[in-house]
Amino acid sequence: MPTYSTRARIALSLLAAAGLAAAALATSPIASAATNPAKYEKAQVGLTYTVYAPTTSIELKRSSFQLIDCGGGKDEQLIASFGSQMSNSGWINLNESQTGCLDGPDGVGLVTKFKVKGATATIKGSCKGQVSSCSKSNPARLRKGSGYTTVTLPAGSSALKSTFVEVYTAGMSVKDIKEFVSGLEPVQ
């Protein structure tokens, strides 16, 4: 059995405690309540952009819900996930902010555009051969790989601003993505 110094034992204890804390957070009601409208309504307080809550999760189990710092004096960004990137049943990651917090992914090309709440949503899918950029992709690559959808949805009231929405997906069809994005409703 190896002998550890006092510092090493303390470091190992802290790592173990951090792991237990992370596991507790992952199974907490906050993490598992992503489709609960009350979570979205509560998140709206203090934000200047309109928070949109999904009315469907395309039968994917909710997996997380959080507000994170967007930096640069911007409002916090809302992030909610459904399903798992590691499963074959699909994954959706919803990001809402006043403007994009991060650049979108590389290696995606246009699949289609559609209208939602008067705005144009753009669905992009994985590029053939996993190249860093392409002008077009197709629904089959979207379904087998990853997707990235963006739309700026209108303000829910005159007191709020419009919302930049990014939807990252894995293993989802164009129909699924359209259903999810079209089902986003402003909280009251």
List where the protein language model places each region.
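C-terminal region of N-terminal signal peptides and the immediate post-cleavage residues
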Residues: 1-6, 11, 20-43
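Surface-exposed amphipathic alpha-helical segments
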Residues: 161-188
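A broad, low-specificity signal marking well-ordered, structured residues that form hydrophobic/aromatic
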Residues: 31, 80, 165
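A generic alpha-helix preference that emphasizes hydrophobic side chains
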Residues: 17, 30, 57-58, 181
